[in-house]
């Protein structure tokens, strides 16, 4: 006798009742062995051990409308990688699949008895990284798309007293992870499916329904569903999972649903919504929904299409200020994930999580409890045998920097060609990139922003503990974190003041290796004026902040170093612009150098009060080369140091840009302010994941104008989970966050990703996954509808392997995110 499989579903929980095994699977295991012919491929399942592959399982069931039931189904999982000592077997076949331009073997694959086993990594080739594998069975989508494979019945609803089929079935499906070694040109993946059943009649609140779907061959062949929208989380209700301060002047959530091949659901306006206390389940606030953006209206950002493909309804509860933990529920539809309204569990918590993400990028020290749950040995330290050689190539002329002359074709060519035998023993520490382990001076944008927070609210941030190794010293933790990233460049500063632009290996990381297992040659970039300007500006800011908090002796060290770097950079700059080859310098490099020169001049003038830097700032000030960072400094200088007209120009620069951002936010369905005019949304610009533009912070601090604060808060909603995916775009935050950022250390050692990593996020797939590319082909094949047809606001694929979505950078993602959240926590 076979035991039927049922689930009981209510309050967003699924309880299996009577499930011993799946009899549908047991009837014929062979037909589910879909990988049997592909076991020689990387990422395929392990050889058969007689263990049954698990069927797809139901993760959540809820309505998106009173007559549309959404069933969320997950399929397959990945067996994590692990590193073990390599013990050679006579049957092993070793293949070198990649070498650096120097002939360094940085990818050695092991095949044992015809089966791909893993990669040999690390010094001495003593470690084996076992390949990840897929486990489980994919959803039979043909069965899932057939309305005849579903029945709904209920003894409590006369409309459903007899079994009925849905009148239509729609679906959207997406990959949710790729095996690490199968991420490029691969075929294996895990998946998530949203199945929408268009019901013949409206459901009745409080009534239990039995939904049968045996032909889908899931972990249960039927389930009971209690229709109680005030308790069940609905995919259609989008709220920030970070929450709000009580005095935040703007608090919104959203309602929308794009049903894949069913299109966007059209909701009536004036729906009632409520704020419900998570503890008491009592209604605390009620309001009426209003139309935010219609699905047929193009947005004024990105490629100026509609980026949601569904009506976006706004749920405004700005007038609700009572501290507590809540969920927002829409009448007849369902609820959001829970969120807090208070001063400690919201922006401050998010700020601390983001700062922990920055800490987890430290190089040169071991990472382990109690400072982080991510465990990693010390990386790239000379005492462990790592040698860093001087290159004659500067970051200015590297493809990893500005590639000023356009001569670097593969990012590493000029660096490696400039190799010398000179060792740079001081080249350790700093903060690493994401999928790579470089430390480039561009990362100092984060240190600059952290120091700015300290400068704006020293009394607030001096007491914030970030739980880092320096927490017991006499500096605020925020300053310590900024200085850790900065100090490597001071240690590498040349006696004449020149600043090296960072540290880089000869190639991208070896497959399967971790940061403490580098086998490639490692180089320090040669000094250049661009890198020296960046350093001079941030070091000057460090000195200024140290003076503010009373650390005058430490401030002197940084001031001397900053001035020395600037005085070296100026004649180098003059030589650069007067040499014959300057005409060949690409325009973007000229602009970037001018920007950093202008900013460094502003920083040094504020710090030293030396008029030569004031003259340089004013001489280099223009629309292209003055960032709001520099204008923000100049606009706040003591009146005795500036001409009133010049200071007004600085202030106007900030406010004009902030006003443009306010306007831009109004032209976006979700109020985004990180878009760059004329560019598609997403990619390295991280349009969706960076909460807001720092310019809005500066405008609000200067004026106190609530419009800027409201725009900040509105823009910060999307990345906090108030988006069509209900996904927080930073690891470790909220109840549903990104799981698979491109973080090689954890991926290759079977650990969860560290918290605090803000990924690049969704993008306009047609732009960033070009026709004919690997990602375009995979997403079009693995998604329903095709991945290139998805709305960009929902086009985040948490697959680890797509750098334009799953990666992040210290200076572009982590720094600005912590800065925005830190300001929202501290602001007055």
Which residues does each predicted region cover?
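Short coil/linker segments at helix-helix boundaries
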Residues: 452-484, 521, 541-558
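Carboxylate/His-rich catalytic cores and anion/metal-binding grooves
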Residues: 475-499
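Low-complexity, Pro/Ser/Thr- and charge-rich linker/hinge segments at domain boundaries
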Residues: 30, 226-250, 336-375
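Surface-exposed, short loops/turns at beta-strand junctions within beta-sandwich domains
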Residues: 198-206, 318-323
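Short acidic/polar inter-strand loop motif in beta-rich domains
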Residues: 215-221, 332-338
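Solenoid-like repeat scaffolds
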Residues: 620-626
């Amino acid at each position: 006798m076979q035991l039927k499989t049922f689930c009981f579903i209510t309050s967003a929980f699924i309880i299996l009742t009577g499930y011993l095994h799946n009899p549908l699977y047991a009837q014929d295991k062979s037909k589910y062995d879909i990988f049997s012919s592909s076991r020689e491929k990387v990422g395929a399942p392990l050889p058969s051990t007689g263990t049954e592959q698990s069927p797809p399982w139901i993760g959540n069931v809820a309505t998106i409308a009173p007559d549309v039931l959404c069933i969320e189904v997950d399929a397959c999982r990945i067996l994590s990688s692990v590193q073990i000592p390599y013990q050679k077997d006579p049957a092993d076949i070793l293949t070198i699949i990649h070498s650096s331009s120097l002939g360094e073997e940085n990818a050695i694959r092991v095949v044992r008895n015809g089966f791909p086993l893993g990669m040999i990594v690390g010094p001495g080739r003593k470690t084996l990284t076992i390949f990840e594998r897929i486990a489980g069975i994919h959803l039979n989508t043909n069965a899932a798309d057939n309305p005849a494979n579903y029945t709904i019945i209920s003894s409590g609803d006369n409309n459903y007293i007899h079994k009925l089929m849905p009148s239509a079935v729609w679906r959207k499906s997406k990959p949710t992870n790729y095996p690490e070694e199968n991420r490029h040109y691969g075929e294996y993946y895990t998946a998530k499916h949203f199945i929408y059943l268009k019901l013949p009649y409206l459901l009745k609140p409080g009534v239990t329904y039995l939904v049968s779907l045996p032909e889908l061959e899931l972990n249960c062949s039927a389930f009971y569903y209690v229709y109680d929208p005030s308790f069940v989380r609905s995919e259609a209700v989008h709220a920030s999972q970070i929450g709000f301060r009580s005095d935040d002047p703007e608090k919104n959530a959203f309602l929308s649903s794009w049903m894949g091949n069913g299109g966007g659901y059209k909701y009536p306006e004036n729906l009632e919504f409520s704020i419900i206390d998570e503890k008491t389940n009592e209604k605390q606030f009620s309001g009426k929904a209003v139309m935010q953006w219609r699905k047929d209206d193009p947005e004024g950002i990105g490629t100026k299409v509609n980026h949601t493909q569904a009506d976006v309804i706004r749920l405004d509860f700005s007038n609700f200020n009572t501290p507590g933990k809540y969920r927002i529920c829409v009448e007849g539809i369902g609820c959001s994930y829970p969120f807090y309204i208070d001063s400690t569990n919201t922006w401050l918590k998010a700020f601390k999580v983001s700062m922990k993400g920055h800490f987890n990028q430290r190089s040169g020290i071991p990472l382990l409890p109690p400072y982080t749950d991510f465990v990693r040995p010390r990386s790239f330290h000379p005492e462990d045998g790592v040698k860093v050689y001087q290159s004659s190539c500067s970051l200015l002329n590297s493809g990893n920097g500005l590639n000023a002359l356009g001569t670097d074709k593969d990012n590493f060519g000029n660096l490696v060609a400039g190799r010398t035998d000179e060792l740079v023993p001081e080249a350790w520490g700093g903060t690493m990139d994401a999928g790579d382990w470089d430390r480039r001076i561009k990362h100092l944008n984060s240190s600059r922003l952290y120091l700015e927070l300290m400068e704006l609210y020293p009394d607030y941030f001096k007491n914030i503990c970030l739980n880092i190794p320096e927490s017991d010293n006499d500096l605020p933790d925020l300053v310590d974190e900024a200085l850790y990233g900065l100090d490597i460049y001071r240690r590498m500063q040349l006696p004449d003041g020149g600043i090296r632009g960072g540290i880089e290996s000869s190639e991208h990381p070896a497959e399967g290796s971790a940061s403490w297992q580098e086998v490639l040659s490692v180089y320090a970039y040669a000094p250049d004026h661009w890198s020296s300007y960046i350093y001079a500006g941030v070091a000057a800011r460090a000195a200024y902040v140290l003076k503010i908090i009373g650390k005058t002796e430490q401030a002197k060290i940084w001031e001397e170093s900053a001035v020395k770097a600037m005085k070296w950079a100026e004649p180098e700059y003059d030589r650069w612009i007067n040499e014959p080859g300057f005409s060949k310098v690409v325009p973007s490099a000229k602009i970037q150098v001018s920007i950093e020169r202008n900013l460094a001049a502003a920083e040094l003038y504020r710090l030293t009060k030396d008029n030569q830097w004031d003259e340089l700032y004013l001489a280099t000030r223009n629309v292209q080369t003055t960032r709001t960072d520099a204008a923000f400094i100049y606009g706040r200088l003591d009146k005795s140091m500036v001409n009133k007209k010049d200071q007004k120009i600085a202030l106007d620069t900030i406010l004009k840009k902030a006003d443009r951002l306010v306007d831009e936010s109004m032209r976006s369905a979700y109020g985004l302010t990180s878009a760059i005019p004329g560019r598609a949304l997403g990619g390295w610009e991280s349009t969706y994941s960076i909460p807001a533009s720092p310019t809005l912070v500066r405008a609000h601090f200067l004026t106190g104008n609530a419009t800027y604060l409201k725009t900040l808060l509105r823009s910060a909603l999307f990345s906090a989970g108030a988006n069509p995916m209900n996904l927080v775009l930073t690891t470790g935050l909220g109840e549903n966050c990104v799981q698979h950022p491109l973080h090689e250390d954890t991926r290759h050692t079977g650990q969860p990703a560290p918290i605090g990593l803000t990924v690049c996020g969704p993008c306009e797939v047609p732009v960033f996954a070009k026709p004919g590319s690997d990602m375009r082909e995979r997403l079009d094949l693995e998604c329903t509808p095709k991945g290139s047809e998805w709305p960009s606001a929902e086009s985040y694929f948490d697959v680890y392997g797509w750098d334009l979505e799953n990666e992040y950078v210290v200076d572009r993602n982590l720094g600005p995110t912590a800065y925005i959240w830190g300001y929202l926590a501290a602001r007055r």
